UniProtKB/Swiss-Prot annotation:
Bidirectionally degrades single-stranded DNA into large acid-insoluble oligonucleotides, which are then degraded further into small acid-soluble oligonucleotides. InterPro entries: Exonuc_VII_L, Exonuc_VII_lsu_C, OB-fold_nuc-bd_dom. Keywords: Cytoplasm, Exonuclease, Hydrolase, Nuclease. This is Exodeoxyribonuclease 7 large subunit. Its EC number is 3.1.11.6. It is found in: Cytoplasm. The gene is xseA. GO terms for cellular component: cytoplasm; exodeoxyribonuclease VII complex. CDD domains: ExoVII_LU_OBF. GO terms for molecular function: exodeoxyribonuclease VII activity; nucleic acid binding.
């Protein structure tokens, strides 16, 4: 036996492994239509059965994680469409199928057509996100393409009326089921684009079987949706129903009611937002007024600090301080001179030169006299300046005016009485005199003819 022949010798296990790998690699997944027989379901939950036709049969298994997605329970003798992978059970050398999904034969053929069209349109780019148009926000007018007598239209109108009653709606009635339905749906989409009345379209219908929804898996409908210049929201069936129209549309809604919510504004939410904006504006206004009130208070305080009465009082206080300082300074100088004189006298007494003492005494007396004269002149000057300042202060004092025989009269509101227009007969007045106040009542108001002023008569 040659070396090359020896390398081609297989063991049984190696043969079965090689065949299994070849089948799985070359065949992959396939669609198979057949009749079920020998169906069984052990405690593990897996399904085991035979798929056959009138000439052959093959073993098949469907594991629990796959069969739980099946919407029906298979029966012996039932025609089904199965998507499965081909493999080989190595211990026995039996080749078999591992089913991934299963449908009744009628729906299964439709599903196969669905998958084929889906792959074709996806390859052409009809599902690409780059082609999706954004929905208007907010929509000004909504178009609805569906059956005029279906529950879907009722649901859409009910939601729009609840959320946004003022939103205009245009209905493009069409069949949604049957042989003629796809062409009618296409024409309705084209008509809506031709009229350009709406800025968003809802295309859909209520729930049903795969066959009932088949109009929305039609290639013509898919291309009409793709070519629409108006954004389209698909709303076909229930949330679990998926059609070709859902993939092509600019946005998919799980139900017609959900589509109506997507294209409409929630007026309750808008009112809530407006109320929030109003509350924020009120808070901002309150803050602004509080800031302006504080500013006004500060300005009022500054104005009060500049009042003439306060300024006069401060000047008078300053004058009094200066007077005290002047007097204290003079007294201090006198005390210092007196102490110096005493020291000199003590020194003179110790020396006792009588003549010199007499002369020094005279000089001291003269100096003391001149000093007193100088201090007196300086004090007189300060007194004169102080008297002038007091006279000036007295001249502008309201009390000095009262002392000269004048009076100040106030209205009941507390304002100074300047003209007869401020009062009328029966009003009570308060008059400020030099030594007190007088309360009076007006009995008559007379206007002077020459000066055109009213005369106030009091009692």
């Amino acid at each position: 036996m040659s070396q090359s022949s020896a390398s081609s010798i297989f063991t049984v296990s190696r043969l079965n492994q090689t065949v299994r790998e070849l089948l799985e690699r070359e065949m992959g997944q396939i669609w198979l239509t057949a009749e079920i027989s020998n169906f069984s379901q052990p405690a593990s939950g897996h399904w085991y059965f035979t798929l056959k036709d009138d000439r052959a049969q093959v073993r098949c298994a469907m594991f629990r994680n796959s069969n739980r997605r099946t919407t029906f329970r298979p029966q012996n003798g039932q025609q089904v469409l199965v998507r499965a992978s081909i493999t080989l059970y190595e211990p026995r050398g039996d080749y078999q199928l591992i089913a991934e999904s299963m449908q009744p034969a009628g729906d299964g053929l439709l599903q196969q057509q669905f998958e084929q069209l889906k792959q074709q349109l996806a390859a052409e780019g009809l599902f690409d996100q780059s082609h999706k148009q954004p929905l208007p926000s907010p929509a000004k007018q909504v178009g609805v393409i569906t059956s005029a007598s279906g529950a879907a239209l009722h649901d859409v109108l009910h939601v729009l009326q609840r959320r946004d009653p003022s939103l205009p709606v245009i209905i493009y009635p069409t069949s949604v089921q049957g042989v003629d339905a796809p062409l009618q749906i296409v024409r309705a989409i084209q008509l809506a684009n031709l009229r350009a009345e709406c800025d968003v379209l809802i295309v859909g219908r209520g729930g049903g079987s795969l066959e009932d929804l088949w109009s929305f898996n039609d290639e013509r409908v898919a291309r009409a949706i793709f070519n629409s210049h108006i954004p389209i929201v698909s709303a076909v069936g229930h949330e679990t129903d998926v059609t070709i129209a859902d993939f092509v549309a600019d946005l998919r809604a799980p139900t017609p009611s959900a589509a109506a919510e997507l294209v409409s504004r929630n007026q309750i939410e808008l009112v809530r937002q407006i109320q929030g904006q109003q509350q924020r504006m009120e808070m901002a206004m309150d803050y602004y007024l509080a800031q302006r009130t504080q500013q006004f208070t500060r300005l009022e305080h500054r104005l009060q600090q500049q009042h003439p009465h306060l300024r006069l009082a401060r000047q008078q206080t300053l004058l009094l301080k200066l007077q005290r300082r002047l007097e204290e300074s003079a007294q201090t100088q006198i005390r210092l001179l007196s102490k110096r004189t005493e020291r000199l006298q003590q020194r003179l007494q110790q020396v006792q030169p009588q003549g010199q003492i007499h002369r020094y005494n005279q000089r001291v007396q003269q100096q003391e006299y001149r000093l007193r004269q100088a201090v007196e002149r300086q004090l007189n000057g300060y007194r004169q300046r102080f008297g002038i300042a007091c006279s000036q202060l007295e001249a502008v004092s309201p009390l000095a005016t009262l002392a000269r025989g004048y009076s100040v009269t106030q209205t009941p509101a507390g304002a100074l009485l300047k003209t007869t227009k401020q009062v009328q007969a029966g009003d009570k007045l308060t008059t400020r005199l030099q030594d007190g106040w007088v309360e009076s009542e007006i009995t008559q108001v007379t206007v002077a003819k020459k000066s055109r002023q009213k005369k106030v008569v009091t009692q």
